């Protein structure tokens, strides 16, 4: 019996990856077939058949003989080391569009997490917009409500613009960064802004990107014009390694104090983000490893979608 590696399932996995994951959960983690079917969104009969197919094809022997084994090992280590609820590590492929593949992986994770009519809070950035573009049909069919976590309407349009016009989207009607702390306070006190921020904090699931100070000019927050290169240099000198929603934190995951932009941001602060039950971080690139690790240490995310090389770098850091 041969494995069909060309067909991609509704869960975004080829058959070999499904077999590898089922085998790992069954033999390594000790899950029952019923528990595995719930986790992967498959019928119990499908799980049983794929286990048998794994044995007959040679994937399942004394060890899991699959190119996905490394990803599964990284997922287990990340889950244990950082107390994560959910992890998806995608295998590395030469010359592949990592951002697009992360978006696919994050989209399938969200499809397994969100129930009909629940609310999804979204942060700005390429990773989250890549995810949103691949969720449009699911969002429409399941009547998922969307709410933005920060101001800056333009930053969200590449994702929101792909959605059905009937989709419920609550956007903060303000810039991401005001020109002064006083103006930011005034805007956040406006009911139209305050109501969206309250809705965002009440979301069932959140998805955010993670920026790294080490990215320098490649960082979304710089390319979008929200901070200057000089500001980024100053922020780095204060010990910051990464940011979520424009809020910078150090290697321990603590928000760095005395940073001007923090008082000028219009969005959900990280302390409020942590009250959302499931917080998915989607980010890749070895230069982001320290920032991703810090975000997990700070508890800003409790679920992660990343690539194999980045996962290895995180575990080495």
UniProtKB/Swiss-Prot annotation:
Residue ranges of DNA binding: 33-56
Single annotated GO MF: DNA binding
Similarity comment: family membership: Belongs to the SorC transcriptional regulatory family.
Keyword Ligase assigned: no
Cellular component aspect of the GO annotation: cytoplasm
Keyword Transcription: yes
Species of provenance: Escherichia coli O157:H7
Record keywords: Cytoplasm, DNA-binding, Repressor, Transcription, Transcription regulation
Stated regulation of activity: Inactivated by phosphorylated autoinducer-2 (phospho-AI-2). Phospho-AI-2 acts by binding to LsrR, which is then unable to bind to the promoter regions, allowing the transcription of the target genes.
Role, per record: Transcriptional regulator that represses the expression of the lsr operon in the absence of the quorum-sensing signaling molecule autoinducer 2 (AI-2). It also represses the expression of the lsrRK operon. Acts by binding directly to the lsrA and lsrR promoter regions. In the presence of phosphorylated autoinducer-2 (phospho-AI-2), LsrR is inactivated, leading to the transcription of the genes.
UniProt name for this protein: Transcriptional regulator LsrR
Localization, UniProt: Cytoplasm
Main location, first listed in the record: cytoplasm
């Amino acid at each position: 019996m041969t494995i069909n590696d060309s067909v991609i399932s509704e869960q975004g996995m080829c058959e070999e990856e499904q077999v590898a994951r089922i085998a790992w959960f069954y033999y390594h983690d000790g899950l029952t077939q019923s528990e595995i079917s719930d986790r992967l969104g498959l019928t119990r009969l499908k799980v049983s058949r794929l286990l048998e197919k794994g044995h007959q094809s040679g994937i399942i022997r004394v060890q899991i003989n699959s190119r996905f084994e490394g990803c599964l090992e990284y997922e287990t280590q990340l889950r244990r080391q950082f107390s994560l609820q959910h992890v998806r590590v995608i295998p590395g492929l030469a010359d592949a569009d990592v951002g697009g593949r992360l978006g696919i992986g994050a989209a399938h994770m969200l499809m397994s997490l969100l129930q009909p009519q629940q609310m999804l809070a979204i942060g700005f950035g390429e990773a989250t917009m890549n995810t949103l573009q691949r969720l449009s049909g699911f969002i429409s069919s399941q009547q998922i409500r969307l709410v933005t976590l920060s101001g800056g309407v333009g930053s969200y349009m590449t994702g929101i613009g792909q959605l059905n016009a009937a989709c419920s989207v609550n956007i903060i009607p303000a810039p991401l960064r005001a020109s002064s702390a006083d103006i930011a306070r005034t805007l956040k006190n406006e009911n139209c802004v305050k109501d969206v921020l309250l809705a965002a904090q009440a979301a069932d699931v959140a998805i955010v990107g993670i920026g790294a100070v080490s990215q320098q000019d490649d960082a979304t927050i710089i390319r979008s014009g929200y901070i200057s290169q000089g500001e980024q240099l100053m922020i780095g000198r204060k010990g910051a390694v990464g940011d979520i929603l424009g809020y910078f934190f150090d290697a321990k995951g603590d928000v760095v104090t005395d940073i001007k932009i923090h008082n000028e941001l219009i969005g959900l602060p990280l302390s409020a983000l942590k009250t959302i039950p499931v917080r998915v971080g989607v980010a890749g690139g070895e230069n982001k490893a320290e920032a991703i690790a810090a975000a997990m240490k700070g508890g800003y995310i409790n679920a992660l979608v990343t690539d194999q090389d980045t996962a290895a770098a995180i575990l080495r850091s």
